[in-house]
Amino acid sequence: MTNVSVPTEKEPRVVLSARGLRRDFGGFTAVRDVDLDVHHAQVHALIGPNGAGKTTVFNLLTKFLQPSAGTITLLGTDITRTPPDKVARMGLVRSFQISAVFPHLTVLDNVRVALQRPNGLAHQFWRPLSALDTLNGHAEDLLASVGLTKERDHVAADLSYGRKRVLEIATTLALDPKVLLLDEPMAGMGQEDVSVIAELIREVAKTRAVLMVEHNLSVVADICHHVTVLQRGEILAEGDYETVSRDPRVRTAYMGTEDA
């Protein structure tokens, strides 16, 4: 009898990778030997107790800090020494970088402003009408994709906190990121807003990679494909949520006891 192998689903491609990442501050090592692979069309969570090094890792990946050792690769290109503005143009975008939510502009105008750079209009004084029509069309499409069409003419300052976060994500998406980094996107939200943002992140990740720091473990369990747990600047555990949540080391790190 001939053995027939059953094809397995192809592993999503790695779009952002770190190897041996370390960051020293004087005699203190904040991040040590971190290896990380972020895959296209997946949501990857970076979790851990306070002081675990999550924000430092984000700052290293987005080049706001230079690593003391290790390498970072984006879409196959070494970006270890690349400045943050160039990294953003290459497709690695962190939400606060584009916090172009101007409170006195309308929702639509906020998105139009954010879209000017990727559409080549940021530094053009005279613009053909066709270019503006294209810009407006892209802005309307982007608002529709995040569910903000009804609020298109609302002034940003009048939006609820949750809707402002949606608008912030929309302005970030205007740069067409290949990898989107979100730093605690659910912070300060009520449950209704949390559900909306979680579903938006799930949709966004269908066409790009998402790496997020998040303390809401219910959200992590619901939408994340892969979880990396940090403790004292080192990787403690990784895998899917079910795997890491059962790890006694993770329980100890979060709860102080393996029996928690």
Located regions from the model:
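Glycine-rich phosphate-binding loops of nucleotide-dependent enzymes
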Residues: T2-A260
